[in-house]
Amino acid sequence: MNNIKTGVVLARLHPIHNGHLELIEQACDENDQVFIFIGSADKFNQRNPIPINLRKQLAEEALEELAKRYLTGVIPADVHIVPLDDLTDESDNSHDWGFYLFTKILKEADTPYFTIYYSDGFEIITTWFPSFVMRNNVSLKLIARGATCSGISATKVRKMILDGDDEELKKWVPQCVYDCRETLKKHIQLANMIK
């Protein structure tokens, strides 16, 4: 077993918001390396309206903003952003999905031991992996969605963008997302035309 502590954040980032950043910051504070897997990388629909290249770019820019919070100006972990296609569909919580995710993490992180940082229900993650994997390889750090930034969600952020609620939006997203709101609005509007 290696001594490098590895954290994994799995999120779709449609778009990245301050709740995601709280989760990422905690993972960075507690690990040597952090892998941010951007899920549903291969999807474009109402639930997944922002192309993966833009989500990845905004995540990178948000991390640059996050680094400024540290005295050194550097995030204390080695951070990697990795697009992750869905295995079947995003509601798949089977062991097949768990093994798919596990092998992707193993390939990227080069370790079978990691902590997943997540803000949805505990029961969801426990359905992904057989008990022996949970017991031997995977630790969980669950942060209640309501506990991160007063329960902000990407769905709420997208609504603020569509409604042009710039004042409220500015409170909940990194500056890079706020600055990109018109481009994001066009992607969201286009995706909303798809039935």
Describe each PLM feature range.
Residues 1-195:
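Nucleotidyltransferase catalytic core that binds NTPs
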